[in-house]
């Protein structure tokens, strides 16, 4: 250090330490990439028709921010007819994803027509839709029949159950009653219907069989950034 001022020596030491630190610790942006990136899974989007019925009377008071009625529970059976959709590069157009919420379990049904890649994609999406299940969750495969008409809807999920409903017509007796922005399902407009019969029974202990219960029919458009689905 002979011939150098104390100030120049201090700056040299500081610069040396700074270079060592730069090469030793990763940049903040790199650390961010490590913790985010694709950790949340593939990007996805699905849109189409939602067909649903539950054990509540018409109208289901859950759709208006209240508890179930006239019983203390609300068990539901529904299906998503995916008219356009993808999970990453996997196309999901024309497939269906059905589900039920019961006393003993929640069960997802993958369309039996799905390829192995599509089935994995639908299972992954199902996991995103149901974020905080309160009961056990199962995933199975089934033939799903979903029909949407001008005066009613119909759903059959394999041998497990289904329903048929007629839309509730308004005062003009021509157009159905519609509820906008309901509190249960993320669909802009929900056509209200009444089931002729809603029945379901599975191997997990869920069972219900009722008549004249609530039904909803509407369009959905969900993706991996949608804040809430139902």
Regions found by a protein language model. Give the residues of each.
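Signal peptide processing junction and immediate N-terminal pro/mature segment
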Residues: 22-33
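Bacterial N-terminal signal peptides
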Residues: 11-21
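Beta-strand-enriched cores of mature, soluble protein domains
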Residues: 42-230
């Amino acid at each position: 250090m002979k011939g150098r001022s104390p100030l120049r020596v201090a700056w040299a030491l500081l610069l040396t330490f700074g270079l060592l630190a730069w090469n030793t610790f990763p940049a903040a942006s790199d650390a961010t990439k490590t913790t985010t990136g694709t950790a949340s899974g593939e990007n996805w989007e699905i849109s189409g028709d939602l067909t649903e019925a539950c054990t509540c009377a018409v109208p289901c008071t859950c759709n208006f921010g209240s508890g179930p009625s006239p019983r203390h529970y609300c068990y539901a059976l529904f299906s998503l007819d995916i008219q356009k959709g993808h999970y990453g590069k996997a196309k999901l157009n024309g497939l269906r994803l059905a589900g039920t919420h019961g006393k003993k379990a929640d069960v997802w049904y993958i369309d039996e027509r799905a390829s192995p890649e599509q089935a994995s994609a639908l299972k992954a999406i199902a996991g995103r839709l149901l974020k905080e299940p309160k009961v056990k969750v199962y995933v199975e495969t089934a033939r799903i029949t979903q029909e949407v008409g001008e005066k009613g809807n119909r759903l059959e999920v394999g041998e497990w159950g289904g329903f048929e409903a007629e839309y509730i017509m308004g005062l003009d007796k021509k157009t159905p009653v519609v509820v906008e922005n309901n509190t249960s399902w993320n669909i802009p407009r929900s056509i209200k219907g009444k089931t002729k019969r809603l029945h379901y029974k599975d191997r997990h202990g869920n069972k219900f069989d009722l008549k004249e219960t609530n039904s909803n029919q509407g369009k959905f458009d969900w993706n991996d950034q949608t804040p809430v689905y139902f």
